[in-house]
Structures are given as structure tokens and as C-alpha cells.
């Protein structure tokens, strides 16, 4: 199965067309040649949104002028299906097989595992970044997770607004407390469940990439008790002017041997941990969706030595429906050169 991708007035691409085979495809080229834009366009076609910016900022710029419109077409040449995303004068539309929508319906979305350069800082970055990473993955396997996250964030915001008032109704606070406790427990338990599955696979995956016998694990640090009843008890026992417990405080650590990886592992070892994590996530997604899932890797191998880079590209989980970008590539896999 191959796809034909066409971009018009999309970022730096005026009118660019490329065929993407079903096997691992590596997009190479210098910075500024539009590699990430190709990844973004595919993500847009399958998910109906961009992780980089809003739709208006995607417009191609020539000098000081911005184009009035942009368009992405992605055609599955085997199934003879086409996805078209159009944006013009603030209006966007999604067309799938001649049916047009103002937003891409959930039933029309295709699962995508996205890995971007910022994810390489998972070990050193903030708990927020780590939560966002695992949530992005869970949401691809369980669509209700994102809806519950959105609702949880709204409830958290409203509860904090109420707590900051000099006078508020205890009954109203109780309503927010109940919703907060239930959602926080659900989200944290789901995160713990997936992190535990990943942790059980992490050492073997790391050892395959690194060629070592190092033990690597994940350790979940919940931001609150795991049951809604226990969370409710903590909330009613404290009336701080800010919600200090809950799923918004969840975190997880990478354990390398007996110590936290960011303290004892080398830079290369840390990056290999992340690649092992990504490979596991890809395997889990493929177990659920088969070859339907698409893997997008944006500039993640820049600091790997040659042998680890080859080991990464040779992992079975990346051999089909995977597109990655890199500055340069020398090898046997299919590649596309830009610039």
C-alpha cells in the first residue's frame, strides 16, 4: 500500500507532491527544507489538527506576504481513498471520499504515534511534558481518555477559581470536589496501567537497541491517592486556595539499574531509553490497530552513533507505515531527499 501526498501553499512548500511507500521511509535534507512540514501534513490528514500551530500559521510566506489558502491531499492508492484538508480565509474543511466536514469526525481519524524532538527531553523535562507524552499515546488507544482529560482540566480550573474567592458556597465546592475526585482517579489509574505495561517491556527493548544487559524500568509517582474516595477525603480535609493534589500532579521516573536515569545514564543511554519507549508504544499500538496505525518520527536520531541508529531503524516495529525525518542518511531503507 502506498500513498500520494500533495501540499499546496503549506509552510515552505508551494506545490510539492511525493509518493510514500508502505515500508519505513526516511526524509532527509537540510534544516529549513520542509521535512517536518511533510510529517505535519500527514498528521493533519489523519488527526484533523496540527501539534505545531493553528491553521492560520501554516500559510506559506513569500517575503512579507502570506498566502490566502493552503491545501493537503493524501491519497491511498491501494484503497482509492482521498483525504483533503483545505484552509482559506479562516475557514477549514475536511473531505474524506467526497464527504465534507467542518471538523474531522472521530470515526474518520486514523491512529498516529507522533514523536517530536522535544520528546527527547522526557527524562530531564518537566512532569507536565511527561504527562502530555503518555496522555498523547493513551488517547490514541482509548479516545475517551482525551475527553476525560479535557473535562478534568475544566473542573480543576473551576475549582481553583472558586477556592480563590473570599466567600463561596460549600455545596458548590462539593459538586466540583466530587467531579474532580472521580476524574482524577480514573485518569491516574489509566496512566498507571499503561506505564506498568510499558515498564515490563522496557528492559528487553533497551537491551535490543543498545546491545547491553542493562535493567531499565518506569516508576509511577501519583499526585494523589488512587481511589476517588481517598481523594475526596483529602480535599474535604484541606481548604487551600489552590488544588494541590490530583492527576495534574502525576509523574513518572525512568530507573536505570537502581538509580534515576537522568542522574547516572549517559546522554546516549538516555536517548536509547527514549527510543526503547517509543518502540514499545509502537508495538502496543500495532497490537490494537495492526498496520492501520501510522508512526511519525521527527528528527529523533541526530545524536545517535551509527550502530545505534542502524539498530533503531531495523526494529521490527518501524518496518511499515513509519515516516521519519533526519538531516542525513546512508543506508538501505527507502529515503526521500529534500533541498
Report residues per predicted region.
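Conserved NTPase motor "head" modules and their coupling/switch loops across ABC/AAA+ ATPases, GTPases
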Residues: 1-30, 174-294, 303, 307, ...
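Nucleotide-state sensing region of NTPase/ATPase domains
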Residues: 44-129, 138-141, 145, 199, ...
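Walker B catalytic acidic pair
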Residues: 298-300
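Conserved lysine of the Walker
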Residues: 35
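A short helix-turn-beta junction within AAA+ P-loop NTPase domains corresponding to the substrate/partner-engaging
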Residues: 332-339
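Structural recognition of the conserved hydrophobic beta-strand(s) that form the central parallel beta-sheet
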Residues: 320-328
Amino acid at each position: 500500500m502506498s500513498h500520494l501526498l500533495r501540499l499546496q501553499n503549506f509552510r515552505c512548500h508551494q506545490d510539492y507532491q511525493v509518493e510514500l511507500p508502505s515500508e519505513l521511509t526516511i526524509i532527509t535534507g537540510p534544516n529549513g527544507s520542509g521535512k517536518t512540514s511533510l510529517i505535519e501534513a500527514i498528521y493533519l490528514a489523519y488527526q484533523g489538527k496540527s501539534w505545531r500551530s493553528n491553521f492560520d500559521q501554516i500559510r506559506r510566506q513569500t517575503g512579507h506576504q502570506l498566502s490566502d489558502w493552503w491545501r493537503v491531499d493524501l491519497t491511498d492508492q491501494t484503497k482509492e481513498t482521498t483525504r483533503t484538508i483545505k484552509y482559506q480565509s479562516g475557514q477549514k474543511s475536511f473531505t474524506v471520499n467526497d464527504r465534507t466536514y467542518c471538523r474531522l469526525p472521530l470515526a474518520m481519524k486514523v491512529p498516529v504515534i507522533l514523536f517530536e524532538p522535544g520528546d527527547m527531553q522526557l527524562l530531564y523535562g518537566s512532569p507536565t511534558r511527561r504527562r502530555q507524552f503518555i496522555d498523547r499515546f493513551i488517547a490514541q488507544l482509548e479516545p475517551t481518555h482525551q475527553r476525560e482529560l479535557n473535562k478534568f482540566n475544566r473542573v480543576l480550573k473551576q475549582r481553583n477559581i472558586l477556592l480563590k474567592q473570599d466567600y463561596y458556597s460549600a455545596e458548590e465546592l462539593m459538586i466540583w470536589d466530587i467531579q474532580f475526585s472521580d476524574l482524577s482517579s480514573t485518569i491516574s489509574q489509566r496512566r498507571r496501567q499503561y506505564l506498568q505495561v510499558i515498564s515490563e517491556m522496557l528492559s528487553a527493548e533497551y537491551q535490543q537497541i543498545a546491545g547491553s544487559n542493562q535493567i531499565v524500568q518506569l516508576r509511577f509517582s501519583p499526585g494523589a491517592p488512587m481511589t476517588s474516595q481517598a481523594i475526596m477525603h483529602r480535599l474535604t480535609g484541606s481548604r487551600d486556595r489552590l488544588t494541590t493534589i490530583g492527576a495534574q500532579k502525576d509523574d513518572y521516573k525512568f530507573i536505570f539499574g537502581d538509580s534515576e536515569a537522568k542522574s547516572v545514564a549517559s546522554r546516549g543511554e538516555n536517548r536509547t531509553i527514549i527510543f526503547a519507549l517509543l518502540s514499545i508504544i509502537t508495538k502496543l499500538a500495532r497490537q490494537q490497530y495492526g498496520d492501520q496505525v501510522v508512526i511519525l518520527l521527527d528528527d529523533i536520531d541526530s545524536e545517535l552513533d551509527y550502530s545505534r541508529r542502524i539498530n533503531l531503524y531495523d526494529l521490527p516495529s518501524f518496518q511499515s507505515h513509519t515516516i521519519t525525518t533526519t538531516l542525513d542518511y546512508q543506508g538501505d531503507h527507502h529515503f526521500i531527499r529534500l533541498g
